[in-house]
């Protein structure tokens, strides 16, 4: 949806909300679409009158994206325009307003509204707060691209070394993605204020400043079931299976890493389990046959996962002579795992991941 379309829709939504308030009526409306406010650095100016005949002007700035960076830009402009004039009230409007953007607006005395009619306004005794309307315009396009396979390689690097400052070139090399892909990831991270830039020109570096927010957003957009699963059965107990698998794969120099219950048992011993999970960078059936595991459709106790992207193996760690995924990957996998996985993920977060922040 382009800006003129958003302006038209926001104008209609605000008009409907105000007219149904029983307290305000609209006197006059001007918008950038009609060129009448083109010099005023706003998109819509709406004059309203209270039932006590007092008039105010609502200055509405529209952005096509509602991430915190754009909210701050709009808020800064609206504060400048409404400074020392109590007859003016600024409103930030966009397709969807994130929770952080809402907080930014409220903290600065600025209203907000989205295309579903969720809104917040407070001026001269008038208060309106509408939440919970289903927003069909809530796009996951930006987040989808931020949490896509190639992009998440950069996120793993940042989260595994959260205190380091990076040049785009260095992060791209470490994450094994192109310079262009890394630049796009950086731009999106800036939009959501997950990172902070320092320096000037070519010396400009950036570092993670909201690791928990980024990790939580990623976990909401990730499910371990995105990987390909191969289930097998062995008569051995899980501990013996894990030792046998680890010894064999190391002898063959095949990359692997335990995760889920098997990974948690070595980093966050929180779960009792009867099933082995591991990522494998080889043919699962070939390895299983060599180990004497039987392929099954139900009742398996060994699950070999082929990773959706090789970035899964970034930051793998050796514990008790066994390779497991990074704490970040283990947290992501556990978060939506049904057998008390979320509890194990939080245990891992509190006892291992946070200590690096």
How would you label these PLM feature ranges?
Residues 225-308:
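Short gly/ser-rich loop at a beta-strand->alpha-helix junction or flexible surface loop bordering the NTP-binding
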Residues 109-121:
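Charged, structured surface patches that assemble and position nucleic-acid processing machinery
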Residues 128-153:
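Short alpha-helical segments that sit at the start of domains
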Residues 38-83, 91, 331:
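Conserved catalytic cores of phosphodiester-cleaving nucleases, focusing on short active-site segments
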Residues 1-33:
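Acidic-basic catalytic patches of nuclease active cores, encompassing PD-(D/E)XK
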Residues 28-44, 291, 296-357:
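C-terminal regulatory/effector modules of DNA-binding transcriptional regulators
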Residues 154-217:
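Loop-centered beta-sheet repeat module
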Residues 83-109:
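Nucleic-acid nuclease catalytic cores
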């Amino acid at each position: 949806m382009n800006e003129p379309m958003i302006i038209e829709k926001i104008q209609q939504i605000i008009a409907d909300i105000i007219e149904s308030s029983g307290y305000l009526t609209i006197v006059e409306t001007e918008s950038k679409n009609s060129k009448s406010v083109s010099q005023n650095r706003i998109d819509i100016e709406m004059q309203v009158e209270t039932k006590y005949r007092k008039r105010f002007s609502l200055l509405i700035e529209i952005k096509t994206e509602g991430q915190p960076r754009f909210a701050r830009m709009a808020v800064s402009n609206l504060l400048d325009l409404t400074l020392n004039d109590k007859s003016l009230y600024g409103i930030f409007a966009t397709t969807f307003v994130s929770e952080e953007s809402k907080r930014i607006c409220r903290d600065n005395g600025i209203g907000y509204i989205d295309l579903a009619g969720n809104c917040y306004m407070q001026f001269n005794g008038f208060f309106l707060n509408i939440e919970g309307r289903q927003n069909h315009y809530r796009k996951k396009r930006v987040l989808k691209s931020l949490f896509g396979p190639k992009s998440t390689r950069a996120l793993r690097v940042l989260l595994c070394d959260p205190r380091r400052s990076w040049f785009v070139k260095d992060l791209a090399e470490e994450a094994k993605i192109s310079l262009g892909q890394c630049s796009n990831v950086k731009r999106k991270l800036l939009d959501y204020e997950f990172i902070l830039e320092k320096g000037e020109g070519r010396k400009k570096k950036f570092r993670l400043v909201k690791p928990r927010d980024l990790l939580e957003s990623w976990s909401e957009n990730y499910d371990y079931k995105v990987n390909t699963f191969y289930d097998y059965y062995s008569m051995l107990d899980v501990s013996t299976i894990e030792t046998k698998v680890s010894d064999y794969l190391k002898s063959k120099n095949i990359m692997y890493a335990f995760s889920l219950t098997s990974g948690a048992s070595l980093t966050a011993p929180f779960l009792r389990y009867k099933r082995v999970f591991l990522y494998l960078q080889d043919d699962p059936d070939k390895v299983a046959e060599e180990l004497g595991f039987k392929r099954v459709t139900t009742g398996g106790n060994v699950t070999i996962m082929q990773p959706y992207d090789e970035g899964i193996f970034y930051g793998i760690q050796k514990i008790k002579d066994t390779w497991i995924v990074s704490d970040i990957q283990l947290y992501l996998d556990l978060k939506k795992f049904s057998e008390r996985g979320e509890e194990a993920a939080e245990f891992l977060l509190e006892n291992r991941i946070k200590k690096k922040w």
